């Protein structure tokens, strides 16, 4: 039990932080959503988004 997160105060702090984090994510611009984090690309390029929507339209073929 040496992690220190098992206390009631720690749990309350994490809940408040999670709420603040959600509000901050909503205000993030589209450019920030597609930012490169440590060499890993986050988000879909516009070409991939167009390709996925095109496949979705062609899928129901009965």
From Swiss-Prot:
It comes from the Eukaryota. This is Overexpressed in colon carcinoma 1 protein homolog. Residues 1-16 have a biased composition (Gly residues). It comes from Gallus gallus (Chicken). Signal peptide: none annotated. PANTHER family: OVEREXPRESSED IN COLON CARCINOMA 1 PROTEIN (PTHR38502:SF1). The lineage of its organism: Eukaryota, Metazoa, Chordata, Craniata, Vertebrata. Residues 1-62 are annotated as: Disordered. Belongs to the OCC1 family.
